[in-house]
UniProtKB/Swiss-Prot annotation:
Molecular-function GO terms, alphabetical: DNA binding; DNA-directed RNA polymerase activity; protein dimerization activity
Name by which UniProt lists this protein: DNA-directed RNA polymerase subunit alpha
Taxonomic lineage of the native organism: Eukaryota, Viridiplantae, Streptophyta, Embryophyta, Tracheophyta
InterPro entries, sorted: DNA-dir_RNA_pol_insert (IPR011262), DNA-dir_RNA_pol_RpoA/D/Rpb3 (IPR011263), DNA-dir_RpoA (IPR011773), RBP11-like (IPR036603), RNAP_asu_C (IPR011260), RNApol_insert_sf (IPR036643)
Domain notes: The N-terminal domain is essential for RNAP assembly and basal transcription, whereas the C-terminal domain is involved in interaction with transcriptional regulators and with upstream promoter elements.
Catalytic activity: RNA(n) + a ribonucleoside 5'-triphosphate = RNA(n+1) + diphosphate
Gene behind the chain: rpoA
Entry keyword Transmembrane: no
Documented EC number(s): 2.7.7.6
General function of this protein: DNA-dependent RNA polymerase catalyzes the transcription of DNA into RNA using the four ribonucleoside triphosphates as substrates.
Localization, UniProt: Plastid, Chloroplast
Pfam families attached to this UniProt entry: RNA_pol_A_bac (PF01000), RNA_pol_A_CTD (PF03118), RNA_pol_L (PF01193)
Ranges for region Alpha N-terminal domain (alpha-NTD): 1-233
Gene Ontology CC terms: chloroplast; DNA-directed RNA polymerase complex; mitochondrion
Subunit annotation: In plastids the minimal PEP RNA polymerase catalytic core is composed of four subunits: alpha, beta, beta', and beta''. When a (nuclear-encoded) sigma factor is associated with the core the holoenzyme is formed, which can initiate transcription.
Amino acid sequence: MVREEVAGSTQTLQWKCVESRVDSKRLYYGRFILSPLRKGQADTVGIALRRALLGEIEGTCITRAKFGSVPHEYSTIAGIEESVQEILLNLKEIVLRSNLYGVRDASICVKGPRYITAQDIILPPSVEIVDTAQPIANLTEPIDFCIELQIKRDRGYQTELRKNYQDGSYPIDAVSMPVRNVNYSIFSCGNGNEKHEILFLEIWTNGSLTPKEALYEASRNLIDLFLPFLHAEEEGTSFEENKNRFTPPLFTFQKRLTNLKKNKKGIPLNCIFIDQLELPSRTYNCLKRANIHTLLDLLSKTEEDLMRIESFRMEDRKQIWDTLEKYLPMDLLKNKLSF
């Protein structure tokens, strides 16, 4: 993420594609802008869209292959140059395009000698191959080669446990991530009170959908996440109707920190260094990068300040409070700690 100062004028909020190109069958690029945004809004939108694009977009891939009586994935098959493991890795790289849901069957059945590519996969009508030239295997002898495949539409990266199946069926780690990379940059425009921000968003996809299609799907997914809040009042949801549902504790992390700050007597917080708290190295490094060195520094930050720290996660927030409770008993927290 990059910030720069540029000259600009205030306009109605709008977005447009400023660059679009196809670098190869499996690499599409798009660059978009959204403006004008108030200070801080570009970061909010950029972070949300980046996460939604990388983790919420659905993709179709091969998830299982059945070779017949093959003892294990490191086996070699007579007349085939590649091992079973190499063939599985090649199948994992095949990029598919579809709108199917659930599991579908596909297959490969050819006779050597010849090269096998993605074009040789027999697919259901609803599935297309993005790059038919992707290699799968090389048959060096006149043998019959048949594989049964399973295809699934999903999202994210799904790792399968490696097992030796007696029927020769092997799982393939599913990479259902059509968006290969996302980058955003923020440019500040105007002067004084007229200052606003422009968000530039760059998207690279694997060719199964265009960057514009990916942006639309990510935006739709984000909207769907917030819809329950918009309809909650209309549905007349009450505590009585939802008494069996989980309710987050009212005593939040931020309230706990606020209570600590209210204490005026006791151990000086600027004499307690975060090194003494025995925090996990990941949490400790996040705090150090944000120039938080003492307990006073930590308690001077709001919950929002902490969540804005690079690489800081919800788990880090919980770890900080759990550590404070462990090393500083609640009666001490309530009565003795001070600034």
